[in-house]
């Protein structure tokens, strides 16, 4: 990790030429002016925690207004199997104020995404701290033939999201080094890696920490609307696995046919030292790979036979709902421990605990966000505003015949636009899910499909949003190789990826929709 972090250290240089270039770009280009407006507008937005606090306050006030208006909504409750009429419940009366105070702790501790993320991060923290993730990415990229290097960099970027944000820190700087070692433009390597890591954030061949996190928020939204339906963390798996292949192809095409030709030959004076995987890391990777194979074999024995340990009445549904997150943790923890022991980065149990503790410490911001988000979601549940909005909205959309695939495509575009201003995937979904998941459900679209559409929109515009949390880091990496690079330059570099990924990924969903293929082990499109 230290080697990779060293790569992103900036050179000392005179900033006058760079500032002039950036200012000229922003003044002379309509696109630059647009980017400037996006940057200014986005910078005026408060922190996501503050946004949730304001939203919670709005729910409290609106609940009182709608309660006083006495607006009823009648709908068919599938759980009760009867027509139900509901009214808004106020939070500004004695009972409501008591609920706000008495439920605050329980709202937080029972918030479904909280436990799933923290448990998974225990394993990820050990794997990252031991150096397993860093060594794996270096081995994957540095051992690739020249003709496949672009595809492998994009693929490695996509796969890195199983370790949450490690790809931003490790792979993006590494992309520049690898491309330069092949005599290619380092900014093209940064762009390819950044596109894979960020624009392909939701795609992967295997399940990562994002899957249970978003599924937990989806289930919270369903519970808040009193909908008797549970989405599994694997609900989008098949589609996201195939998406990985599509995005690698699209990323390769954009890099080699659009971005790199536009960049031209690299004339900078910067040079890089060759990066290698040490002998200790090689031994550690072999041992970690063997341990992962043994763990996978044991896991398959526990789920495949008819009387398998994790099957209840011959079914894996309960395991997929309750037991998958600990398996994800072990998927990282076991090879992480083995790698660390063999490579020498873990000398005792204290080192492993230190790595896990460091991962937990990094989740402090998420814990604060989860607390306020859980209050907002539960206020929606208590006041019935979520149900009122979902039912009335679905009836409106149905009355104008705006349903099915057109609605899903429109939702992808909405999610992509909102992502320009709110960077956190979980924060956005916690805001949008209580409204759109029940609304789509009432229009016979499954929560799996709604969440899938959100993930496409959320991922594809990450790379052109200055508010994305790692955007400043990427700017720093780019400036190391091109002192005249400004914010608009980086976004214009990444815009082709964003547009083509959004179009291509949406087209894949359309084709998938019409073929009727399942989007996951239990992922249908339409409710029966």
Predicted regions and their residues:
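Membrane-interfacial loop-to-helix junctions in multi-pass transporters
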Residues: 94-96, 106-114, 141-152, 186-188, ...
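Interfacial/capping segments of alpha-helical transmembrane domains
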Residues: 65-95, 210-214, 307-313, 383-392, ...
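Hydrophobic alpha-helical transmembrane segments of multi-pass integral membrane proteins
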Residues: 117-119, 145-176, 181, 367-373, ...
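Membrane-core helix-loop-helix motifs of multi-pass transport proteins
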Residues: 39, 43, 170-266, 453-455, ...
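Hydrophobic core segments of alpha-helical transmembrane domains in multi-pass membrane transport
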Residues: 52-67, 117-125, 156-158, 196-200, ...
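Interfacial loop/helix-cap signal at membrane boundaries in integral membrane proteins
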Residues: 33-34, 72-114, 224-232, 302-319, ...
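Juxtamembrane interface elements at the cytosolic ends of transmembrane helices
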Residues: 30-31, 132-136, 249-273, 300-311, ...
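Core transmembrane alpha-helical segments of multi-pass membrane transporters/permeases
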Residues: 45-57, 81-134, 317-387
């Amino acid at each position: 990790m230290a080697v990779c972090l060293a790569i992103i250290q900036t050179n000392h240089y005179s900033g006058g030429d760079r500032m002039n270039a950036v200012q000229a770009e922003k003044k002379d280009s309509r696109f630059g002016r647009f980017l400037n407006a996006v940057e200014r507008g986005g910078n005026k937005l408060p922190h996501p925690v503050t946004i949730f606090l304001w939203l919670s306050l709005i729910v409290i006030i609106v609940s009182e207004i709608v309660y006083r208006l006495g607006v009823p909504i009648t709908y068919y409750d599938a759980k009760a199997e009867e027509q139900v009429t509901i009214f808004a419940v106020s939070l500004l009366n004695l009972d409501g104020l008591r609920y706000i105070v008495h439920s605050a702790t329980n709202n937080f501790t029972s918030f479904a995404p909280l436990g799933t993320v923290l448990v998974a991060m225990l394993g990820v923290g050990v794997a990252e701290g031991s150096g397993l993730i860093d060594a794996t990415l270096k081995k994957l990229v540095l051992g690739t033939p020249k003709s496949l290097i672009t595809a492998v960099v994009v693929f490695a970027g996509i796969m890195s999201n199983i370790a949450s944000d490690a790809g931003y820190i490790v792979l993006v700087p590494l992309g520049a080094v690898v491309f330069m070692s092949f005599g290619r433009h380092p900014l093209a390597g940064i762009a390819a890696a950044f596109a894979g890591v960020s624009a392909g954030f939701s795609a992967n061949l295997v399940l990562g920490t994002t899957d249970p996190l978003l599924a937990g928020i989806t289930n919270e939204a369903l519970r808040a609307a009193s909908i008797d339906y549970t989405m599994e963390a694997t609900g989008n798996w098949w589609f996201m696995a195939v998406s990985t292949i599509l995005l690698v192809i699209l990323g390769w095409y954009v890099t080699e046919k659009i971005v790199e030709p536009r960049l031209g030959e690299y004339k900078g004076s910067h040079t890089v030292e060759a990066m290698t995987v040490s002998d200790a890391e090689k031994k550690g990777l072999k041992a970690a790979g063997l341990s992962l194979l043994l763990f996978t074999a044991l896991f398959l024995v526990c789920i495949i036979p008819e009387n398998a340990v994790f099957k209840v009445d011959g079914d894996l549904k309960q395991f997929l709902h309750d037991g998958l997150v600990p398996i994800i943790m072990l998927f990282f923890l076991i090879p992480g421990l083995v790698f660390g022991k063999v490579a020498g980065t873990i000398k005792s149990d204290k080192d492993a605990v230190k790595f896990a503790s460091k991962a937990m410490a990094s989740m402090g911001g998420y814990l604060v966000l989860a607390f306020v988000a859980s209050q907002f979601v539960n206020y929606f549940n208590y006041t019935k505003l979520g149900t009122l909005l979902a039912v009335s909205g679905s009836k409106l959309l149905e009355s104008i015949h705006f349903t099915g695939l057109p609605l899903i495509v429109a939702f992808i575009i909405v999610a992509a636009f909102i992502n320009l201003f709110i960077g956190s995937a979980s924060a956005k979904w916690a805001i949008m899910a209580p409204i759109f998941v029940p609304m789509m459900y009432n229009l016979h679209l499954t929560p799996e499909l709604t969440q899938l559409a959100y993930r496409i929109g959320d991922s594809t515009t990450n790379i052109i949003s200055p508010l994305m949390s790692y955007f400043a880091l990427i700017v720093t990496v780019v400036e190391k190789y091109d002192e005249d690079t400004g914010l608009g330059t980086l976004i214009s570099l990444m815009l082709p990826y964003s547009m083509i990924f959004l179009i291509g990924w949406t087209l894949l969903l359309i084709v998938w929709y019409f073929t009727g293929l399942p989007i996951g082990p239990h992922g249908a499109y339409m409710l029966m």
